[in-house]
């Protein structure tokens, strides 16, 4: 696969996964009976852990190639999605906390590594193409939100929906 296509695919998958999760937050809130404050507290942990994931990915990229890290971290996002669905189905708060931590760490580390790869592609091509990668992310976020909305309308469980997303997005 050509480097630009591969990095575009990484941005696309990340946008789709993120929007799929965010669009289904009301179902998670309903399943657990979270108040607005409780939900805000749970969700605040995701970007905090994502920041940790970004820093760790940056540190590890010195030792391993960012493409290798990107593949591994994308698996964390997929696992986080599936575990989020399973936690919601089982109404297990400890499992949900673990799932959101996996998602946060995975999202942050994927963000860092896919941007590292994007910079590499720019150097390879000799011109700026980062905006096109972010456009793929945005398109995927729209499609992910639409897919999540359609899944909610058909009563597909979170576990079922997130499992499909995980299988499709992680090659």
Question: Predicted regions span which residues?
Answer:
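Pair of pore-lining "gating" transmembrane helices in MFS-fold secondary transporters
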Residues: 1-26, 30, 101-102
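Hydrophobic core of transmembrane alpha-helices in multi-pass small-molecule transporters
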Residues: 12, 93-110
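Residue-level signature of mid-helix packing/kink "hotspots" within the transmembrane helices
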Residues: 47-55, 141-142
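Helix-to-loop junctions at the C-terminal end of transmembrane segments
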Residues: 53-66, 152
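Primarily marks hydrophobic transmembrane alpha-helices of the MFS/SLC 12-helix fold
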Residues: 67-74
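C-terminal ends and interior cores of transmembrane alpha-helices
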Residues: 75-90
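Intracellular juxtamembrane helix-capping segments at the cytosolic ends
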Residues: 108-123
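Symmetry-related core transmembrane helices of the 12-TM Major Facilitator Superfamily/SLC fold
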Residues: 159-171
């Amino acid at each position: 696969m050509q480097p630009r296509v591969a990095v575009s695919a990484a941005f696309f998958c990340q946008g789709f996964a993120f929007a799929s999760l965010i669009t289904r937050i009301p179902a998670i809130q309903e399943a657990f009976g979270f108040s607005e404050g409780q939900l805000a507290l749970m969700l605040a942990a995701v970007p905090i852990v994502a920041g940790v994931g970004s820093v760790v990915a940056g540190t590890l990229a010195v030792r391993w190639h960012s493409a290798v890290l990107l593949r591994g971290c994308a698996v964390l996002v997929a696992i986080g999605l599936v575990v989020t669905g399973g936690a919601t189905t089982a109404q297990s708060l400890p499992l949900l906390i673990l799932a959101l931590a996996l998602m946060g760490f995975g999202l942050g580390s994927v963000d860092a590594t896919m941007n590292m790869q994007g910079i590499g592609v720019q150097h390879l091509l000799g011109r700026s193409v980062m905006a096109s990668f972010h456009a793929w992310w945005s398109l995927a976020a729209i499609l992910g939100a639409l897919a999540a909305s359609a899944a909610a309308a058909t009563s597909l469980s979170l576990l079922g929906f997130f499992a499909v997303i995980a299988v499709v997005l992680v090659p």
